[in-house]
Regions:
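Primarily marks secretory-pathway-exposed extracellular/lumenal segments that are disulfide-
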Residues: 189-216
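Active-site and adjacent substrate-binding regions of carbohydrate-active enzymes
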Residues: 1-193
Length: 216
Protein backbone atom coordinates (compact mmCIF):
# COMPACT_ATOMS: atom_id res chain seq x y z
CA UNK A 1 0.00 0.00 0.00
CA UNK A 2 1.05 3.60 -0.62
CA UNK A 3 0.33 6.52 1.69
CA UNK A 4 -1.38 9.52 0.08
CA UNK A 5 -0.53 12.50 2.32
CA UNK A 6 -2.28 15.80 1.67
CA UNK A 7 -2.66 19.26 3.16
CA UNK A 8 -5.86 20.56 1.58
CA UNK A 9 -9.11 18.83 0.65
CA UNK A 10 -12.83 19.48 0.12
CA UNK A 11 -13.40 18.79 3.83
CA UNK A 12 -11.45 21.74 5.25
CA UNK A 13 -11.09 25.48 4.58
CA UNK A 14 -8.35 26.47 2.14
CA UNK A 15 -4.88 26.52 3.63
CA UNK A 16 -4.05 30.12 2.69
CA UNK A 17 -7.23 31.30 4.43
CA UNK A 18 -6.42 29.29 7.55
CA UNK A 19 -2.90 30.75 7.48
CA UNK A 20 -4.12 34.34 6.97
CA UNK A 21 -3.43 35.81 10.41
CA UNK A 22 -5.20 39.09 9.63
CA UNK A 23 -8.68 37.54 9.69
CA UNK A 24 -10.76 35.04 11.65
CA UNK A 25 -13.24 34.03 8.96
CA UNK A 26 -11.50 30.91 7.59
CA UNK A 27 -14.15 28.55 8.97
CA UNK A 28 -17.14 30.55 7.75
CA UNK A 29 -19.09 28.85 4.98
CA UNK A 30 -21.95 31.17 3.99
CA UNK A 31 -21.93 34.67 2.54
CA UNK A 32 -24.04 36.10 5.38
CA UNK A 33 -21.30 35.07 7.83
CA UNK A 34 -18.59 36.86 5.87
CA UNK A 35 -16.34 34.74 3.67
CA UNK A 36 -12.55 34.86 3.39
CA UNK A 37 -11.06 37.02 0.69
CA UNK A 38 -7.74 36.77 -1.08
CA UNK A 39 -4.95 37.07 1.54
CA UNK A 40 -3.10 40.34 1.18
CA UNK A 41 -0.12 39.37 3.31
CA UNK A 42 2.76 37.20 2.12
CA UNK A 43 2.80 35.23 5.40
CA UNK A 44 -0.15 33.10 4.24
CA UNK A 45 1.74 32.09 1.11
CA UNK A 46 4.95 31.50 3.07
CA UNK A 47 3.02 29.09 5.28
CA UNK A 48 1.58 27.35 2.22
CA UNK A 49 5.05 26.92 0.73
CA UNK A 50 6.29 25.38 3.98
CA UNK A 51 3.37 22.94 3.95
CA UNK A 52 3.78 21.92 0.34
CA UNK A 53 7.55 21.88 0.66
CA UNK A 54 7.04 19.20 3.31
CA UNK A 55 4.39 17.37 1.28
CA UNK A 56 6.57 17.12 -1.84
CA UNK A 57 9.70 15.93 -0.04
CA UNK A 58 8.39 13.24 2.32
CA UNK A 59 7.30 9.61 1.77
CA UNK A 60 4.10 8.75 -0.03
CA UNK A 61 2.23 9.86 -3.15
CA UNK A 62 1.45 13.55 -2.49
CA UNK A 63 -2.02 14.84 -3.31
CA UNK A 64 -2.72 18.50 -4.06
CA UNK A 65 -6.32 19.70 -3.93
CA UNK A 66 -7.07 21.68 -7.08
CA UNK A 67 -6.15 25.35 -6.75
CA UNK A 68 -3.81 24.82 -3.81
CA UNK A 69 -0.86 24.95 -6.20
CA UNK A 70 -1.38 28.72 -6.48
CA UNK A 71 -2.92 29.28 -3.04
CA UNK A 72 -6.66 29.50 -3.74
CA UNK A 73 -8.53 31.00 -0.77
CA UNK A 74 -11.88 29.97 0.72
CA UNK A 75 -13.73 29.11 3.89
CA UNK A 76 -15.44 25.92 5.00
CA UNK A 77 -17.37 23.71 2.58
CA UNK A 78 -18.88 24.79 0.19
CA UNK A 79 -16.74 27.94 0.00
CA UNK A 80 -13.62 25.82 -0.47
CA UNK A 81 -14.91 24.72 -3.89
CA UNK A 82 -14.29 27.90 -5.90
CA UNK A 83 -13.89 27.50 -9.64
CA UNK A 84 -10.24 27.24 -10.67
CA UNK A 85 -9.04 30.74 -11.48
CA UNK A 86 -7.09 31.53 -14.63
CA UNK A 87 -3.52 32.61 -14.00
CA UNK A 88 -4.28 36.05 -15.41
CA UNK A 89 -6.24 36.71 -12.20
CA UNK A 90 -3.51 35.53 -9.83
CA UNK A 91 -1.67 37.92 -7.56
CA UNK A 92 2.12 38.15 -7.62
CA UNK A 93 2.21 36.02 -4.46
CA UNK A 94 0.00 33.36 -6.02
CA UNK A 95 2.14 33.28 -9.15
CA UNK A 96 5.31 32.90 -7.09
CA UNK A 97 3.78 30.07 -5.06
CA UNK A 98 2.71 28.27 -8.24
CA UNK A 99 6.19 28.60 -9.76
CA UNK A 100 7.88 27.30 -6.60
CA UNK A 101 5.52 24.34 -6.18
CA UNK A 102 5.89 23.49 -9.88
CA UNK A 103 9.68 23.58 -9.66
CA UNK A 104 9.73 21.46 -6.52
CA UNK A 105 7.28 18.99 -8.03
CA UNK A 106 9.52 18.64 -11.08
CA UNK A 107 12.51 17.98 -8.82
CA UNK A 108 10.55 15.28 -7.00
CA UNK A 109 9.65 13.62 -10.30
CA UNK A 110 13.38 13.45 -11.16
CA UNK A 111 14.66 12.38 -7.72
CA UNK A 112 14.52 8.75 -6.61
CA UNK A 113 15.36 9.86 -3.06
CA UNK A 114 12.38 12.21 -2.82
CA UNK A 115 10.10 9.59 -4.37
CA UNK A 116 11.22 6.47 -2.54
CA UNK A 117 13.76 7.48 0.09
CA UNK A 118 13.64 6.75 3.81
CA UNK A 119 12.98 9.72 6.09
CA UNK A 120 15.37 10.59 8.94
CA UNK A 121 15.53 13.79 11.01
CA UNK A 122 18.82 15.70 11.14
CA UNK A 123 17.71 18.71 13.17
CA UNK A 124 14.39 19.76 14.69
CA UNK A 125 13.83 23.19 16.28
CA UNK A 126 10.84 25.46 16.80
CA UNK A 127 11.18 27.17 13.42
CA UNK A 128 13.67 24.92 11.63
CA UNK A 129 13.43 21.32 10.44
CA UNK A 130 16.20 19.48 8.58
CA UNK A 131 15.76 15.91 7.39
CA UNK A 132 17.24 13.46 4.91
CA UNK A 133 15.49 11.34 2.32
CA UNK A 134 17.85 8.41 1.77
CA UNK A 135 17.81 5.96 -1.14
CA UNK A 136 20.66 3.62 -2.09
CA UNK A 137 21.21 5.67 -5.25
CA UNK A 138 20.74 9.19 -3.86
CA UNK A 139 20.39 11.22 -0.66
CA UNK A 140 18.50 14.50 -0.46
CA UNK A 141 18.55 16.82 2.56
CA UNK A 142 15.57 19.13 3.07
CA UNK A 143 15.60 22.34 5.12
CA UNK A 144 12.27 23.91 6.12
CA UNK A 145 12.76 27.29 7.77
CA UNK A 146 9.66 29.17 8.87
CA UNK A 147 11.63 31.78 10.81
CA UNK A 148 14.38 34.36 10.31
CA UNK A 149 17.55 33.82 8.24
CA UNK A 150 19.87 31.26 9.82
CA UNK A 151 22.66 28.84 8.94
CA UNK A 152 23.07 25.06 9.03
CA UNK A 153 26.47 23.36 9.03
CA UNK A 154 27.67 19.83 8.46
CA UNK A 155 27.58 19.74 4.68
CA UNK A 156 30.38 18.77 2.28
CA UNK A 157 31.94 20.45 -0.74
CA UNK A 158 30.06 18.23 -3.19
CA UNK A 159 26.63 18.82 -1.63
CA UNK A 160 24.61 20.89 -4.10
CA UNK A 161 21.51 23.06 -3.60
CA UNK A 162 18.88 21.71 -6.01
CA UNK A 163 15.95 23.88 -4.92
CA UNK A 164 15.62 27.20 -3.14
CA UNK A 165 17.47 30.51 -2.82
CA UNK A 166 19.72 29.46 0.08
CA UNK A 167 23.45 29.27 -0.65
CA UNK A 168 26.25 26.91 0.34
CA UNK A 169 29.80 27.95 1.28
CA UNK A 170 32.47 25.74 2.86
CA UNK A 171 29.95 23.22 4.16
CA UNK A 172 27.62 25.80 5.72
CA UNK A 173 24.20 26.55 4.28
CA UNK A 174 23.01 30.15 4.60
CA UNK A 175 19.26 29.66 4.91
CA UNK A 176 16.85 32.32 3.70
CA UNK A 177 13.91 33.35 5.90
CA UNK A 178 10.62 31.49 5.33
CA UNK A 179 12.29 29.15 2.87
CA UNK A 180 12.34 25.61 1.56
CA UNK A 181 15.73 24.26 0.47
CA UNK A 182 16.63 20.88 -1.02
CA UNK A 183 20.28 19.75 -1.16
CA UNK A 184 21.61 16.72 -2.96
CA UNK A 185 24.32 15.11 -0.83
CA UNK A 186 27.49 13.70 -2.39
CA UNK A 187 26.28 14.84 -5.78
CA UNK A 188 28.02 14.04 -9.03
CA UNK A 189 29.38 17.39 -10.17
CA UNK A 190 29.27 17.73 -13.94
CA UNK A 191 31.80 20.22 -15.28
CA UNK A 192 31.02 21.66 -18.69
CA UNK A 193 33.89 21.27 -21.19
CA UNK A 194 35.89 24.29 -22.29
CA UNK A 195 36.59 24.09 -25.99
CA UNK A 196 39.75 25.48 -27.55
CA UNK A 197 43.16 24.54 -28.92
CA UNK A 198 44.85 22.03 -26.60
CA UNK A 199 48.11 21.76 -28.61
CA UNK A 200 50.74 23.51 -26.50
CA UNK A 201 52.96 24.10 -29.54
CA UNK A 202 50.26 25.89 -31.52
CA UNK A 203 50.14 29.68 -31.72
CA UNK A 204 46.52 29.72 -30.56
CA UNK A 205 47.06 27.32 -27.64
CA UNK A 206 44.45 27.81 -24.91
CA UNK A 207 45.71 26.69 -21.50
CA UNK A 208 42.18 26.75 -20.07
CA UNK A 209 40.73 24.43 -22.74
CA UNK A 210 39.72 20.92 -21.67
CA UNK A 211 38.61 19.66 -25.10
CA UNK A 212 40.16 20.40 -28.47
CA UNK A 213 37.90 22.19 -30.94
CA UNK A 214 40.04 21.48 -34.01
CA UNK A 215 41.26 25.05 -34.35
CA UNK A 216 44.97 24.38 -33.69
Amino acid sequence: SIMVPYVGSHDVPRLTSRADTGTNDAFNQWAEDGLPGQPGDVSAYNAAMQAYGWLLTTPGAPLLYYGDEYGEYGGADPDNRHMYRNESSWSIMETQLFENISELGKLRSESIALQRGEYSTRLAMANLLVYNMTHEDQVMSVVLNRGAPTSVGGFESNDIVRFGESSMLDGTLSVEAHSVTVIELDADIVVAPIYGCTNSTATNFDASATEDDGSC
